[in-house]
Regions:
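Short amphipathic alpha-helices and their capping/turn segments at secondary-structure boundaries
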Residues: 1-4, 42-43, 96-107, 156-165, ...
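Active-site metal-binding loops of divalent metal-dependent hydrolases
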Residues: 11, 58, 175, 246-247
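H/E-rich (His + Asp/Glu) clusters that bind or coordinate divalent metals
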Residues: 180-182, 186-266
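Short, electropositive alpha-helical surface patch
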Residues: 63-82, 162-172, 222-234, 257-266
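Active-site gating/metal-coordination segments in enzymes
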Residues: 66-154, 160-163, 176, 207-211, ...
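Short, well-ordered coil/turn segments that N-cap beta-strands
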Residues: 3-5, 48-54, 80-85, 106-111, ...
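An N-terminally biased module of ancient metal coordination in phosphate/nucleic-acid-related enzymes
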Residues: 1-74, 261-262
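Histidine-centered divalent metal-coordination motifs
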Residues: 10-14, 149, 174
Length: 266
């Protein structure tokens, strides 16, 4: 099994000398308040058969989104690392988004856009404004995808957005962000219903990523992740799921190799 080549579809990097990441100031983020560069990623994955990776935007300060995109696209162009594409940051709720996107949409390394919907200052329904929907439809016109990263209780918002953008591909990050903690299951019914509903649309894909960060540091076991992962496999089927390492965010609870090997066990 270890010999199967792996594409990591959710690779983060950040250089705190270049970028401001406001969310690193939140409680519990101490281990992430460092720079994480390509050399660090290669060391973290050296015992795993990663052959390619796709950069995932890191929720930089909005004023730095253009600079972040330029930075990672330069890495994609280099031949000394596995990065072969990027999902760049952007602000689809803003009228300036179309002009911003025009700068990058022709770059073959740009695969899609993400904006985080679950930050504390981002209210429910943020992705349902007319401006937001218009800009997500624009992504579809350009052959680009949109990554959904939101609170599990609000997944019905994603259903409405998908329905409103019939030509756009969507990727659900982190299995829909449903926690694996037994005492945090109050949103499970809404999450399951929303995931089933989105799985009915063949333009929606599910990324097996991120959920290890909701496990208990130091004591978690692969079995703790199995219920959520099995649900996603059963709901979307093997042709519409893929792996994302979510490094270095996964290091809140696990190193890359232990997370990867947990998935092999599952």
């Amino acid at each position: 099994m270890d010999s199967i080549p792996v594409i990591d579809t959710h690779q983060h990097l950040w250089d705190l000398d270049l970028f401001q990441l406001p969310w690193l100031d939140l409680a519990g983020m101490d281990v992430l308040r460092n720079s994480f560069r390509m050399t660090d990623y290669r060391e973290a994955t050296r015992n795993c058969p990663i052959i390619k990776s796709v950069y995932m935007e890191v929720n930089v300060h909005p004023d730095l989104q253009r600079q972040e995109a330029q930075y990672v696209l330069a890495l994609c162009e280099a031949d000394d690392n596995p990065m072969s594409g990027a999902v760049i940051g952007g602000s689809p709720g803003e009228s300036s988004f179309a002009d911003y996107l025009d700068e990058f949409a022709g770059n073959p390394f740009v695969k899609g856009v993400r904006t985080i919907l679950h930050d504390p200052d981002r209210p429910r329904g943020m992705c349902l404004t007319p401006q937001f929907k218009e800009n997500i439809r624009l992504l579809g016109d350009l052959g680009l995808s949109f990554d959904l990263c939101m609170r599990p209780a609000e997944i019905q918002d994603a259903v409405e957005l998908v329905d409103a953008c019939p030509e756009t591909r969507f990727i659900i990050d982190h299995c829909g962000n449903m926690s694996v903690q037994p005492d945090q299951q109050q949103d499970r019914a809404a999450w399951e219903a929303g995931m089933w509903r989105m799985a009915e649309c063949d333009r929606v894909f599910c990324k097996i990523s991120g959920i290890v960060a909701t496990a208990t540091p130091g004591t978690w076991q692969p079995a703790d992740l199995k219920q959520n992962i099995d649900f996603c496999l059963d709901t979307f089927g093997e042709d519409r799921i893929f792996f994302g390492g979510d490094w270095p965010v996964c290091t809140l609870t696990a190193n890359f190799e232990s997370w990867y090997r947990a998935l092999l066990w599952i």
